[in-house]
Curated annotation (Swiss-Prot):
<keyword id="KW-0597">Phosphoprotein</keyword>
<comment type="similarity">
    <text>Belongs to the RFX family.</text>
</comment>
<feature type="DNA-binding region" description="RFX-type winged-helix">
    <location>
        <begin position="285"/>
        <end position="360"/>
    </location>
</feature>
<feature type="compositionally biased region" description="Pro residues">
    <location>
        <begin position="140"/>
        <end position="149"/>
    </location>
</feature>
<dbReference type="InterPro" id="IPR036388">
    <property type="entry name" value="WH-like_DNA-bd_sf"/>
</dbReference>
<dbReference type="GO" id="GO:0005634">
    <property type="term" value="C:nucleus"/>
</dbReference>
<feature type="region of interest" description="Disordered">
    <location>
        <begin position="377"/>
        <end position="461"/>
    </location>
</feature>
<dbReference type="InterPro" id="IPR003150">
    <property type="entry name" value="DNA-bd_RFX"/>
</dbReference>
<feature type="modified residue" description="Phosphoserine">
    <location>
        <position position="173"/>
    </location>
</feature>
<dbReference type="GO" id="GO:0000978">
    <property type="term" value="F:RNA polymerase II cis-regulatory region sequence-specific DNA binding"/>
</dbReference>
<feature type="compositionally biased region" description="Low complexity">
    <location>
        <begin position="51"/>
        <end position="70"/>
    </location>
</feature>
<feature type="compositionally biased region" description="Polar residues">
    <location>
        <begin position="409"/>
        <end position="428"/>
    </location>
</feature>
<dbReference type="InterPro" id="IPR039779">
    <property type="entry name" value="RFX-like"/>
</dbReference>
<feature type="region of interest" description="Disordered">
    <location>
        <begin position="111"/>
        <end position="156"/>
    </location>
</feature>
<dbReference type="GO" id="GO:0043565">
    <property type="term" value="F:sequence-specific DNA binding"/>
</dbReference>
<dbReference type="GO" id="GO:0000981">
    <property type="term" value="F:DNA-binding transcription factor activity, RNA polymerase II-specific"/>
</dbReference>
<dbReference type="Pfam" id="PF02257">
    <property type="entry name" value="RFX_DNA_binding"/>
</dbReference>
Length: 811
C-alpha cells in the first residue's frame, strides 16, 4: 500500500490546524482510498479526539464548519509533547474523515490529475478503510452519530497498516466499496495485527519445473521403448522372410521419403513417411540380430564385430545402417540378459558382449562361426580378461594401431570385408576370411575398374588418348538402365524403379597399405560405411534431389562412424582407395546421365533445368563437406568433382542441341532429304579434304572413313525419318536420331588406332564442308542442318571428354 500526502506549500502545520489529504492506493490497483487527517496545533496534543464535544471544532477546518457527523477516531495512543522513547514509535492522534460511499468506482487517473482541491461532499466515492470482511461487497448504512466511548474503556491500540478486512489478493480486489463496521463493533472486537499473506499469482518453483522435465524425459523414454517394442513385434512376425526380402521393404520406405517434394508435400505426411522409414530400419536391424545372433551364456563377441557385420549387410543391400548406439539398444531389446565386459590383453582390450554368440546366417551373406567370433569363457585362462563391467553407453575404445585380440587376416577379406566362413586350415583358432568370389583375385578386381582407378594420377596425355573399341559400353551402357518414364517420375515425384536392385560396386581397402595391427573390425566397418555413403551420393544426384545432396556429402557427420573410423579414413594410406571410390561414383553418374543422348524421347526442358541448377550448387556443397578432411584428400576430391561438373555442363549443352533439333526437324525433314539428294556431293568434298601427295596419311584415311559413314548412315537417318513409327510413345524423329547416334559412336569405336584429337579435327572439317555447300545453294532448311551439325560435333567432343574423365585426365 502506498500513501501520498497533498498539502499547500504555504501552510504551516505547527501554527494552525489544516486538512492534510492522503491518497491511499491499494496493492490491487483497482481502488483508491481518500482520507482527510486533521493534525492538531501545538498545545492541543493532550486533548483526546474522542472526548471533545459535538461543537468543538478545534481540530476542524478554520472556517468553523462541522464535520463531526462523519468523524470517527482511530484507536491510537495519546500523543505527548515529550519525545517518545527511542524503542517505541507512536503515531499522532488523528481524526479520520470518512467520505460517504459513492455509487461508482473512482478512477486513479482522474484523482492523480485533478487541478482543483477536492470539494467536500456528503457522498464519498471511495470505500472505507475498514469493512465488514472480504466477502462483503454491499455497503452498510452510515450511522448518523457514532456513540462516544469513555477513555477508560479503550483497549490498547494495535495499529495495522493492512486491516484484516482488506485483502491483497488480486482476484478478490474490487472497485466496489467494502462495508464498514461501527465503532462499537470495533471496540468490542478490537482489530488484530493483520497477517501478511502472499496471495498473488504463484510462480512455479524450481522443484516443480524439475519434476515436469523429469516427467517429460520419462515420457520420451517410454515412447522410445514403445517404438522398439513395436519394431520387435514386427520383426518377430517377419522372421520367415530373408534379409534380402525385407531389405526391399526398407528400401521402399527410403524411396518414399526420397521421392517426396518438401515444397509440395505437407509436413505431417513427410513426418509420417520419415517415421515409417526409421521404424523399418529398426525392424531390419532386429531381424538381422535375430537371424545372426543367439544367446549363449558361455560365449562372448566383440561389440565392434557385431556392428561391422551389420554394416556389411546394409552395404550389400544398399541400405543406410543405424548408428552404433542405436544398434546397441536394439541388441539389449532382443537379448536383455547380456552383460558387457572389457576383455583382452593390456593395451589391446576392448568391450565384448558376454552371453552372445554370432551364428551362421541362412543366406550365407554374413556369417561367423563359433571358433572365430564367439569364444568360450570356460577355456579362457587369461587372468586379465575378467574386468569390471563398463557402462553400456561408453564408447568402444578401438585404436587404429592396436589390433584386436582375435584379429583376422586382412589378405583374405572379401570385397565387402564382412563374409566369414570356416577356415580350412589346420588351426581353427586362426580364422580366415574368404571372398564371395573365390576365383576372382585382387588383381582381376582392380583390372575391372576404370583405368583411372588403377592410376588416379593418369599417365596418358590428351594427344595420346584414343577412343576405345567399346565406346558405347564405356559411355552409354549403364547397369542402372534409364527407365522409359524417368522424365515423368522426376517431375511428378513418384517412386523410382530399379533403385532397389542397383548399387555401385566398389573396391575393398587393399591389403598391405595399413599396419598389420590395425583392427579388422574397424577396417570392415569403414569399408561398408563408405560404400553406403557413395551409393547415397549416387542416388541423390541421380534423382536430382538438391535438398538431400548436402547431407549425403557429409561423411564425417554420420552417426554411424566413430572417431576411430574417421581417423583411419583420413589417414594417408587410404587416400588412393577413397579416390577410387569417388571416381567410380561420379563415373557411374556420368554413364547414367549419358543415356539421355540415346534416349532423346526422355529429354525435356524441365529435366535440363533441374540438372543445370543442381550442378551449379554442387561445387559449393562439396567445399563445405570437405572442410574437416586433410589437404591431400581434399585436393583429390575437388579435382574429381570439378571435372564431373564440367562434363555435366557439356552434356547439358549437347542435350539442348538435341532438343532444339527435334523441335525443328519434323518441319524441315522433307526439305533436308531433298537437299541431301540434290545438293550434297560427298565425292567433291572428299577431294577437297584429302592431300593427293600423301595418300597414306592418317588424315586421308579418316576422311575416307567419314565419307563412307555419311553415304550410309546419314542417308539411312533421313529416309527412316520419313517412315511411320511403330511405337506411339516414341516419335519417328526421336527413334531415327537415336539410331544414328548409336551408329556414329560405333563408327568412332572403329577408329581406335587414331588419336582422339586427330579424329575430332578431321570430322569437324568434313562436316563444315557439307554445311558450307548447303548454305550456298539452299538456306530454307539451314537452321535444322546447323542443329544437326552441332549435335554430331558436340557428341564427338563429349565422348572425348568422357574418355579423359575415366582415365583421370583434366576435363
Amino acid at each position: 500500500m502506498v500513501i501520498f500526502k497533498e498539502r499547500k506549500p504555504t501552510e504551516n502545520l505547527f501554527t494552525r490546524k489544516i486538512p492534510a489529504k492522503y491518497f491511499i492506493f491499494s496493492p490491487s490497483f483497482l481502488s483508491v482510498h481518500y482520507f482527510e487527517f486533521y493534525l492538531p496545533m501545538s498545545g492541543d496534543n493532550n486533548i483526546e479526539p474522542t472526548s471533545r464535544g459535538s461543537n468543538d471544532n478545534s481540530n476542524g477546518p478554520s472556517n468553523g464548519s462541522s464535520v463531526n457527523s462523519n468523524r470517527y477516531s482511530l484507536n491510537a495512543p495519546k500523543y505527548s509533547s515529550q519525545p517518545p522513547p527511542a524503542s517505541h514509535t507512536y503515531l499522532p492522534p488523528m481524526s479520520v474523515n470518512i467520505p460517504p460511499i459513492a455509487s461508482k468506482s473512482s478512477s486513479i487517473y482522474s484523482l492523480l490529475h485533478q487541478s482543483s482541491p477536492r470539494p467536500e461532499t456528503p457522498n464519498p466515492i471511495l470505500p472505507p478503510l475498514i469493512g465488514s470482511g472480504p466477502g462483503s461487497h454491499k455497503p452498510s448504512p452510515t450511522p448518523t452519530q457514532p456513540p462516544a466511548q469513555p477513555a477508560t474503556q479503550r483497549q490498547p491500540a494495535t495499529y495495522s497498516v493492512y486491516p484484516a478486512s482488506i485483502s491483497l489478493n488480486r482476484s478478490n480486489s474490487s472497485a466496489y466499496p467494502l462495508s464498514f463496521k461501527s465503532e462499537e463493533t470495533l471496540n468490542n472486537n478490537p482489530p488484530t495485527a493483520a497477517k501478511r499473506t502472499n496471495t498473488f499469482p504463484s510462480i512455479p518453483s524450481s522443484t516443480k519445473k524439475q519434476k515436469t522435465s523429469q516427467e517429460k524425459r520419462i515420457s520420451s523414454i517410454s515412447r522410445r521403448n514403445t517404438q522398439e517394442i513395436i519394431a520387435k513385434q514386427i520383426a518377430e512376425n517377419n522372421k520367415s522372410k530373408t534379409i534380402e526380402e525385407y531389405a526391399q521393404i526398407v528400401k521402399h520406405a527410403e524411396i518414399k521419403v526420397l521421392s517426396m517434394d518438401s515444397q509440395n508435400t505437407s509436413k505431417a505426411a513427410l513426418q509420417l513417411a520419415e517415421q515409417n522409414r526409421e521404424r523399418e530400419r529398426q525392424v531390419f536391424a532386429l531381424l538381422w540380430l535375430m537371424k545372426n545372433c543367439k544367446s549363449q551364456h558361455d560365449s562372448y563377441v566383440p561389440r565392434g564385430k557385431i556392428f561391422a557385420q551389420y554394416a556389411s549387410s546394409c552395404s550389400q543391400n544398399n541400405l543406410k545402417p543405424l548408428s552404433q548406439a542405436s544398434l546397441g539398444k536394439l541388441i539389449r531389446t532382443v537379448f536383455p540378459d547380456l552383460t558387457t565386459r572389457r576383455l583382452g590383453m593390456r593395451g589391446q582390450s576392448k568391450y565384448h558382449y558376454c552371453g552372445l554368440k554370432l551364428t551362421v546366417n541362412e543366406s550365407g551373406s554374413v556369417s561367423l562361426n563359433n571358433n572365430n567370433a564367439s569364444l568360450s569363457l570356460v577355456h579362457n585362462n587369461d587372468p586379465i580378461s575378467p574386468l569390471s563391467s563398463p557402462s553400456p553407453s561408453s564408447p568402444s575404445p578401438q585404436v587404429p594401431n592396436v589390433s584386436s585380440p582375435f584379429s583376422l587376416n586382412r589378405k583374405s577379406l572379401s570385397r565387402t570385408g564382412s563374409p566369414v566362413k570356416q577356415s580350412s586350415n589346420d588351426n581353427p583358432n586362426e580364422p580366415e576370411l574368404e571372398s564371395q568370389h573365390p576365383n576372382e583375385t585382387e588383381a582381376n578386381k582392380l583390372d575391372s575398374l576404370p583405368p583411372a582407378a588403377n592410376n588416379p594420377t593418369g599417365t596418358l596425355s590428351s594427344d595420346e588418348l584414343t577412343f576405345t573399341h567399346d565406346l558405347i559400353e564405356k559411355v552409354f551402357n549403364c547397369n542402372d538402365k534409364l527407365s522409359d518414364n524417368y522424365n515423368t517420375q522426376i517431375l511428378s515425384n513418384t517412386e523410382h524403379p530399379l533403385l532397389t536392385s542397383y548399387k555401385l560396386d566398389f573396391p575393398k581397402i587393399p591389403a598391405g597399405v595399413l599396419p598389420t595391427d590395425t583392427d579388422s573390425d574397424v577396417i570392415s566397418s569403414l569399408e561398408s560405411l563408405y560404400h553406403i555413403h557413395c551409393n547415397s551420393v549416387y542416388e541423390c544426384i541421380k534423382f536430382l534431389k538438391s535438398d538431400n545432396i548436402s547431407n549425403a556429402l557429409f561423411f564425417s557427420n554420420s552417426n554411424s562412424i566413430s572417431p576411430t573410423m574417421f581417423n583411419l579414413f583420413i589417414s594417408e594410406p587410404l587416400i588412393d582407395w577413397v579416390t577410387k571410390c569417388d571416381l567410380i561414383t561420379y563415373t557411374g553418374l556420368i554413364k547414367f546421365f549419358s543415356q539421355f543422348i540415346i534416349h532423346s524421347n526422355e529429354i525435356s526442358d524441365s529435366i535440363i533445368q533441374k540438372l543445370e541448377s543442381m550442378i551449379k550448387l554442387l561445387p559449393e556443397q562439396i567445399n563445405k563437406a570437405v572442410l574437416e578432411l586433410p589437404k591431400a584428400l581434399v585436393q583429390r576430391k575437388l579435382s574429381i568433382i570439378n571435372n564431373f561438373t564440367k562434363l555435366v555442363k557439356k552434356l547439358i549443352k549437347l542435350l539442348k542441341f538435341i532438343l532444339n533439333f527435334l523441335k525443328s526437324f519434323p518441319i524441315f525433314k522433307s526439305g533436308m532429304n531433298n537437299d541431301w539428294k540434290n545438293i550434297v556431293n560427298l565425292d567433291d568434298i572428299l577431294e577437297m579434304m584429302i592431300n593427293e601427295d600423301d595418300t597414306n596419311s592418317e588424315t586421308n584415311t579418316i576422311m575416307q572413313h567419314l565419307q563412307g559413314f555419311c553415304q550410309v548412315f546419314v542417308t539411312k537417318f533421313l529416309n527412316s525419318s520419313m517412315s511411320v513409327s511403330n511405337d506411339p510413345s516414341v516419335s519417328i524423329e526421336c527413334k531415327s536420331l537415336n539410331e544414328m547416334i548409336k551408329d556414329f559412336c560405333s563408327f568412332i569405336s572403329l577408329q581406335s588406332k587414331f588419336s582422339c584429337l586427330k579424329l575430332i579435327d578431321c570430322s569437324t572439317r568434313f562436316r563444315n564442308a557439307i554445311i558450307g555447300d548447303i548454305s550456298l545453294k539452299s538456306n530454307e532448311n539451314l537452321l535444322s542442318w546447323l542443329f544437326l551439325n552441332n549435335v554430331m560435333g558436340q557428341l564427338l567432343n563429349y565422348c572425348f571428354e568422357v574418355m579423359k574423365f575415366v582415365n583421370g585426365l583434366k576435363v
